[in-house]
């Protein structure tokens, strides 16, 4: 329930009023380096990328920046009316209800990996953070 409320608030703040997603002095903010790691649990493929995001910016912005600057990275998303921006596919691979697969969002900071509690439209990566996009299943193994 709390996750739904947080996501709804982020969605409401971002879409109608794009300026609310950034601080008032965002013109003075610098670009900070971040990493994006794409992991496919089924093929054991791991791809690593470097990009930047505006300080206090969003994961969505970092992924767009990476897509704009790398021929090897593509992502797609949908906008859910209740839950906001939803990561749909990475490099042409999409989650599937039939196959019980999805893209799990993780963060690695100082060697500690945690699951994100918000989506790409709300999460604010920090300098030198590794954002992990993990293609996995919710089915019991």
Task: Give, region by region, the residue ranges found by the protein language model.
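Ubiquitin-like/PB1-type beta-grasp interaction modules and other compact soluble beta-rich domains
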Residues: 2-141
């Amino acid at each position: 329930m709390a996750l739904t409320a947080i996501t709804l608030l982020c969605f409401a703040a971002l879409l109608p009023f794009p300026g609310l997603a950034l601080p008032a002095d965002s013109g003075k903010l610098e670009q900070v380096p971040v990493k994006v790691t794409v992991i496919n649990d089924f093929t054991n493929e791991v791809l690593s990328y470097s990009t930047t995001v505006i300080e206090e910016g969003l994961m969505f912005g970092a992924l767009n920046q990476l897509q704009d600057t790398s021929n090897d990275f593509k992502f797609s998303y949908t906008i859910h009316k209740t839950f906001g921006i939803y990561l749909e596919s990475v490099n042409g691979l999409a989650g599937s209800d039939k196959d019980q697969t999805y893209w799990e969002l993780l963060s690695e900071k100082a060697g500690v990996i945690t699951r994100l509690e918000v989506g790409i439209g709300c999460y604010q990566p920090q300098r030198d953070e590794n954002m992990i996009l993990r293609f996995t299943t919710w089915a019991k193994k």
